[in-house]
UniProtKB/Swiss-Prot annotation:
The gene is sulA. Transmembrane segments: none annotated. InterPro entries: Cell_div_suppressor_SulA, P-loop_NTPase, SulA_CellDiv_inhibitor, SulA_enterobact. It comes from the Bacteria. Induction: By DNA damage, as part of the SOS response. Residues 105-111 are annotated as: FtsZ binding. This is Cell division inhibitor SulA. GO terms for biological process: division septum assembly; DNA repair; negative regulation of cell division; SOS response. Belongs to the SulA family. SUPFAM superfamilies: P-loop containing nucleoside triphosphate hydrolases (SSF52540). Is rapidly cleaved and degraded by the Lon protease once DNA damage is repaired.
Length: 168
């Protein structure tokens, strides 16, 4: 049983790394994605995002974290394999300021990735503005959205929404 779980975990990590490599090496014009996650399972989100963030850390650009209240710990950044000298954080922002800051940061081209926490769904106009900003700055933006744990018998709601012209 343990061996089976270990193989699945290794396969998931390998797939996440391959996906991260492909995304980081692709010539993208910008990307906005929403990551819905369960706060009770942070390791799952880390398995998906960390390989990509590590790859983006190889670029000369910054990584910007717009966090609601929590501060990133230096120990976590280092243990996650992220470049401490390229990670910037701004915390305790209200949602509208967070959205506007994310748009401005993406547009500059100074950041390889901008990560922000928002609880409400985006309007079509907000999503359009973010997408245009990401394309202009050739950057990736991740909107982190915590979801409530599902009730027993409910379908899990956590997931990754990747908005791309290739699929739409």
């Amino acid at each position: 049983m343990y061996f089976s779980h270990q193989n699945r975990a290794h396969g998931s990590r390998r797939l996440a790394k391959e996906t991260a490599d492909a995304l980081a090496q692709a010539e993208t014009r910008g990307l906005i994605s929403e990551v819905m996650y369960n706060e009770d399972q942070p390791r799952m989100t880390q398995m998906v995002l960390l390989p990509l963030l590590q790859q983006l850390g190889l670029q000369s650009r910054w990584q910007l974290w717009l966090t609601p209240q929590q501060r990133l710990s230096r120990e976590w950044v280092e243990s996650a394999g992220l470049p401490l000298t390229k990670v910037m954080q701004v915390s305790q922002m209200n949602p509208q300021v967070t959205l506007d800051s994310m748009i401005r940061a993406l547009e500059t081209g100074n950041y390889s990735v901008v990560i922000a926490w928002l609880h409400d769904d985006l309007t079509d106009d907000e999503h359009r503005r973010l997408t245009e900003a990401a394309e202009k700055g050739n950057a990736m933006g991740f909107l982190m959205r915590p979801v409530q744990p599902s009730l027993p018998g409910d379908r899990p709601r956590s997931g990754l929404r990747i908005h791309s012209r290739m699929v739409h």
